[in-house]
Amino acid sequence: LYTKDGEKYFIVDSHMHYWSAGPDNWVPGAEQYAKGWIECFHAYQSLGPKETHWPIEKFMSYTEDDLMKDVFEDGHVDVAVFQPTYLKEWYTEGFNTTERNAALGEKHPGMFIANTRFDPRDGDVGLTELRRNVERYGSKGVKLYTAEWNNGSRGYKLSDPAAYRYLEAAQNLGIKNVHVHKGPTIWPLDKDAFDVSDVDHAATDFPELNFIVEHVGLPRIEDFCFMATQEPNVYAGLSVAIGGLMHARPKFFAKVMGELLFWVGEDKMTFGSDYGIWEPKWQIEGFVDWDYPSDEFSDYPRLGTAGKKKILGLNAARLYDIKVPDECQLPAEAGTPAAQDDAQLVTGA
């Protein structure tokens, strides 16, 4: 548990990775994409504090020991949620697979939740794989990458009939949480394939699923906010927003947080470090201390200690049925974490 000024914070890192991106895993003939992808990822790390930057060699292939130290020993995290990204067009064994993540999780019981993924372009074979992964690893969530390349296709939409087939199957298998990458583009993927409009469509038609929009739709923050405020089952995943903006662009971060707090609300926001792009320690410590930098942001809702506790762990804990220690529970008057009616626009109406 992270403790600051007598307050205890239960931390759930709801978006992190354990990837393998070294040259030995590059698909022959696609080396330029595998190399370019991980170099683009590495460039994002420069948006964090200088003392947290890694050499590219470590970044490509950090170890289990690196992860356990950075995330749990030094990083204040109590439970971490693996979000897989396959990219098998470029990485022979996959970039960051369910199997790789789950193998680490099985070595450290109670510390990880292993989500899986699907790609509706994989047809019946993909449905079989989804079912097998849920049964094998007990996954309660999926990570979707709508801009991923697949056999000549450079993306899909959640509103596609094929995607609906998979969403129905996932729901029937007990999946509750759908994490969708809708944020900054990584070379060579297409920016438009990360547009948030398809989430609006799917969230309406699958009200029993929670759609966590990772990276809050950046750079489409206003599109995301205006959609999420009227879709009760759409949540804001703050990975990249905190890691990429809090240190490097504090005023822009304040605007992003202000818009999210006004339209979406503190009950529908979840922390994610996006490790190994950024280490969680500085993000958590900085967010606990964070406030708007000037009166320029006076028309946005304030974020107090209770709200920070929700965002840093209690909201995700409720979405994933994670037991929270009694000393980290909020009093009833602080509201219910992960409640679907918390947007400032709604409560103020």
Indicate where each model-derived feature is located.
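Catalytic pocket-lining loop regions of alpha/beta-barrel enzymes
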Residues: 140-141, 155-271, 296-307, 330-334, ...
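Short aromatic-enriched loop/helix-cap "lid" or pocket-rim segments at secondary-structure transitions
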Residues: 22-28, 94-95, 127-129, 154-156, ...
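Active-site gating/metal-coordination segments in enzymes
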Residues: 79-193
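Alpha-helical scaffolding within the catalytic cores
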Residues: 62-69, 96-102, 126-130, 196-199, ...
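Short active-site segment of divalent metal-dependent hydrolases/proteases
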Residues: 18-19, 184, 218, 277
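Histidine-centered divalent metal-coordination motifs
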Residues: 15-21, 181, 215
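Mid-to-C-terminal alpha-helical segments outside catalytic/metal-binding sites
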Residues: 1-14, 21-71, 79, 128-132, ...
